[in-house]
Amino acid sequence: MRRLFLFLALLFAAMPAAAQYAPFNPVADYVTPGQDEPGYRYWVGAAPYRPLYVRAFNDYLVNNGVGGVAPTWQLLRTASDWQKCGHQPFEVPPTFAWPNIVAALRFVGAFIEPVVGQVEPVSVYRNPALNVCAGGAKTSTHLTAGAIDMVPLRPITRDALMLALCRIQLDKGSWNNIGLGFYKGLRFHIDSKKAREWGTAGPRGGYGCPAVLTENGIPYRAPIQIAPPILVQPAATLDPLAPRR
C-alpha cells in the first residue's frame, strides 16, 4: 500500500501544473470567444432592438414557468460554427417557436437537472441558412427552437452521464415526446419534437438506451407515466442578464 501511495504521489508530481489544477469546464470545448457572456453583452448592445426582443423572450419564459431553468442569454446561442459560417453568435428565436423551447426546458428542469445538476445550453435556435452551413439536418429541431444542446456543469464522466440520461429517457422521455442525442464528450441534445434517441451505446457496444442500462447491470423497467410539472419560478429568478424595464 505504501508503494502505491508513493507511485501516485510521483505520478501527480510529474503532471504539468495546469493539468493538476485545471478546473472542470466542459463548456470550453463548445463555446468560442464572442459566444460567451462578454460576447453576449456586446451583441445585445450592438442594435437598439435586441434588448427589446430579449426582454420579450425572457418574459415569455418566466410567464410559462421555465425562466429559471437556464439563463436566458445562454438560450440565445446559435451554432458552435457561427463564426466560420459568418452568422450571429446569438439570436432570439421567432415567436412561433417559443412554445417549443418551453416544452424542452420544462423537461430539462423537471427531470434532468434534479439528477445531473445544472446544465449550460451551448446551441439552441439556428436560422435556416446557419443550419445548412453548420451541417444540420434539413428537419433539424433547432430550426424551430425545440432542441437544446447542452453540457453538465457538475463533474461527471461520459459513461455516467449517458447512464443517467438514458434512465430518464426510458422512464419519462419516451412518452413525453422527448428526443435524446449524444455528441462527443459531454455534449448532449434534448428536443421536444418526438421520442427518439441517437448516439447512445452501452459499454459493450450495444445500441440504444436499453443497452446502456442492461450492459451496466440495470434491468429495464416499464416507465412510470408522470407528466413534467409546471415549474413556477419566483420573481427573484429573473435572468440577471436580461434587460430591465
Spans of model-derived segments:
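Sec-dependent signal peptide hydrophobic core
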Residues: F5-A9
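Catalytic cores and adjacent binding grooves of peptidoglycan-active enzymes
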Residues: Q20-V31, T139-I148, P152-R245
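N-terminal module-boundary/linker segments of secreted carbohydrate-active enzymes
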Residues: Q20-P48
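Cell-envelope/glycan interface and biosynthesis
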Residues: Y42-K194
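N-terminal signal peptide c-region/cleavage motif recognized by signal peptidases
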Residues: A14-P16
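Positively charged n-region of N-terminal signal peptides that target proteins for export
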Residues: M1-R3
